[in-house]
Swiss-Prot record:
It comes from the Bacteria. GO terms for molecular function: hydrolase activity. InterPro entries: Calcineurin-like_PHP_ApaH, Metallo-depent_PP-like, Pantetheine_PDE. SUPFAM superfamilies: Metallo-dependent phosphatases (SSF56300). This is SPbeta prophage-derived uncharacterized protein YotB.
Amino acid sequence: MKIDYVSDLHINHWIPWNVNQIKWEKRTREIVNRLISNGNGEVLVIAGDFTEWNQQTLWVLDEAAKQYEKVYFTYGNHDLYLLSKSQKRKYSDSLGRLNDLIQKAADMKNVTPLIKTTETYKGKVFAGDVMWYLPKGIEGWDFFKGVSNDSNYIWLNGYNKVDGVRAMWKESMDWYETLENTQVDVFVSHVPPVHNPYSPFEPNTCYMVDVPFINAKHWVCGHDHLQAEFDKDGTSFHMNCIGYPYDYDNYPSVNVIPGEEVDSYKTFELKTFEI
């Protein structure tokens, strides 16, 4: 089985929200088709951080579902962001926004969210969740409070910022520990469980999550905006983060579909592995 994968689309930075919804939808679908044009797998995996707008995420999923037998996705931190007062009124809190996305995506017959769930597809076990991080030490919490936008745009009713992070981390961990005796073929998370050895940055507890075990053959993740594949302790890790337009040498203007040569290192396309 061939599996195409991608994460950290941040599509609203490439195709920003437009009061002209018809134009916004058309451009969004066009850039998705550009992104997946090199795909050749049966399954597409999207490891979170679609956009700050659910409607745009649904267009991404709908367009991808036209070309794949199965689309699996989990959510990222940006998929919880509430940027405006109207979003806060509409969703109440960040989990309200997530639940709205899950409910609407459920209408797409070959699209399946992996959010604290497992599913067997053609004999292969897929599992996934955001796998929320837990900042550690003064340095980790200072980064969360002073640098990370998560502390500004994620709202959980009944929790302050610190307790909200702890609660999301605990929910991820409680579920993950139930998989100890499950052999997983493909695990999908937004936050990686290991530090990327190709990363130019020092390890940061807001960009990875410690797990008690890893029993997946393949692990697709993102969050750190890097594109890399590496093996560690018998697991193959796959990262294909698209990230923001300004991360690319050939900075494409917003609302313009990227050409083939976008960067001397990064690519704007899917990557594939086989199981």
